[in-house]
């Protein structure tokens, strides 16, 4: 396979919304049977058990438990691209991309998820609260990494051998252990100088990741090296600090 069918992976967002008006759902998640297994388990949990699982305050647990009771995987669906509404997705701004950009995202962008495994932008999903790092006390798989195993990886690399990693470490770990020698995963890092040290700011990285996905969609990027032209927020590609597996962008 060539680089011309690259895939881009990003993390989901904790903040979610329901939007059934902006875009139509075009596809369904690849592993709904596995997601149903997780949903069935969560519905059996008590308030205290969910609080331990979610590590959240009473109000958040109460709201999410109420949503769980009525949740069904085939109703009140929102395209994943719009369902997640955190910082990264605000800067991606998929709702104002032209149709060609949206088509590009459906072909090239994949969202990793603790609840769904892996998603295309127009897969129909429901709001959920389940981070990939969650310790699944009481579940037959203590870890969601063990639950999903290599399924998201297999789906991701089904028709490509090159992936651009714009996900956090928590989520890219769903893919990286299974990589073969013939496959490439290029990790993008956005660094800024803080007191003489080059570091990645979590918030600024989310903003830049969203903008880079938007850049790729608008430009129809099909080669990893074309991402080196990205220069939003003052970030510039640093050839001196980059390798074949890591593209480093520095804020000047």
UniProtKB/Swiss-Prot annotation:
InterPro entries per record: YaaA
A Gene Ontology cellular-component term: cytosol
Any Pfam family matching the protein: H2O2_YaaD
A biological-process GO annotation: response to hydroperoxide
NCBIfam families with a match to the protein in the record: PRK02101.1-4 (NF002543)
Entry similarity comment: Belongs to the UPF0246 family.
Name assigned to this protein: UPF0246 protein LJ_0535
Provenance organism: Lactobacillus johnsonii (strain CNCM I-12250 / La1 / NCC 533)
Lineage: Bacteria, Bacillati, Bacillota, Bacilli, Lactobacillales
């Amino acid at each position: 396979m060539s680089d011309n069918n690259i895939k881009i992976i990003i993390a989901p967002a904790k903040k979610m919304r329901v939007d059934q008006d902006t875009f139509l759902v075009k596809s369904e998640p690849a592993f709904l049977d596995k997601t149903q297994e997780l949903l069935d388990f969560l519905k059996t949990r008590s308030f205290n058990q969910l609080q331990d699982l979610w590590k959240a305050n009473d109000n958040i647990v109460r709201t999410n438990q109420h949503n769980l009771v009525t949740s069904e995987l085939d109703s009140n669906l929102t395209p994943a691209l719009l369902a997640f509404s955190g910082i990264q997705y605000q800067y991606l701004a998929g709702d104002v991309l032209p149709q060609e950009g949206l088509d590009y995202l459906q072909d090239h962008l994949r969202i990793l998820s603790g609840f769904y495994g892996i998603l295309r932008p127009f897969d129909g999903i429901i709001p959920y609260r389940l981070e990939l790092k969650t310790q699944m006390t009481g579940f037959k798989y203590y870890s969601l990494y063990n639950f999903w195993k290599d399924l998201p990886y297999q789906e991701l690399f089904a028709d490509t051998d090159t992936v651009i990693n714009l996900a956090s470490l928590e989520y890219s770990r769903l893919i990286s252990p299974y990589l073969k020698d013939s496959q490439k995963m290029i990790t993008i890092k956005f660094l800024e100088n803080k007191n003489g040290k080059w570091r990645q700011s979590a918030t600024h990285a989310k903003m830049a990741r969203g903008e880079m996905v938007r850049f790729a969609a608008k430009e129809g990027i099909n080669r990893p090296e074309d991402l080196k032209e990205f220069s939003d927020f003052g970030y510039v590609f640093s050839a001196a600090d980059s390798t074949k597996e890591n593209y480093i962008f520095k804020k000047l």
